[in-house]
């Protein structure tokens, strides 16, 4: 029994040491990653002159395009409505024609 307890303690200590080592490596890699990200950002900033991250110049163009899309959707809906109205009118005329034709043939 005591031998097993000693092994458990040793195993737990070993696992804790490995976990601590792993966490230290993760922390070190995160720091390195942050440094690399900063270097990359600085490189892009120094090697892409004149390019800004300000997209406000495009906002009006985006709004204009959205308005064009909305207008096209409205026009499309109007066309669909006109087509439906034309179909109803054609059906109405067909029924009137058949009614008149039936009356004439009956006379």
From Swiss-Prot:
Q: Which Pfam families match?
A: Filament
UniProt keyword annotations, A-Z: Coiled coil, Intermediate filament, Keratin
The record, for SUPFAM superfamilies, names: Intermediate filament protein, coiled coil region (SSF64593)
Give the start-end ranges of region Coil 1B: 62-107
The yes or no answer to whether the keyword Glycoprotein is present is no
GO terms under cellular component: intermediate filament
Segments forming domain IF rod: 8-107
GO function term, MF aspect, one? structural molecule activity
- Segments carrying the region annotation (Head) are 1-7
This chain's function reads: Plays a significant role in maintaining keratin filament organization in intestinal epithelia. When phosphorylated, plays a role in the secretion of mucin in the small intestine.
| More details | There are two types of cytoskeletal and microfibrillar keratin: I (acidic; 40-55 kDa) and II (neutral to basic; 56-70 kDa).
Of which family is this protein a member?
Belongs to the intermediate filament family.
Query: Subunit structure of this entry?
Result: Heterotetramer of two type I and two type II keratins. Associates with KRT8.
Designated name of the protein: Keratin, type I cytoskeletal 20
Native species of this protein?
Answer: Sus scrofa
Gene for this protein? KRT20
């Amino acid at each position: 029994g005591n031998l097993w307890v000693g092994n458990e303690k040793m195993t737990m200590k070993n696992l804790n040491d490995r976990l601590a080592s792993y966490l230290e490596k993760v922390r070190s890699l995160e720091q390195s990653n942050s440094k690399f990200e900063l270097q990359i950002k600085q490189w892009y900033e120094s090697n892409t002159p004149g390019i800004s991250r300000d997209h406000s110049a495009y906002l009006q163009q985006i709004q204009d395009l959205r308005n064009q899309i909305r207008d096209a959707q409205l026009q499309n809906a109007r066309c669909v409505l006109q087509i439906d109205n034309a179909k109803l009118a054609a059906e109405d005329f067909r029924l009137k024609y058949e009614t008149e034709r039936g009356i004439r043939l009956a006379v």
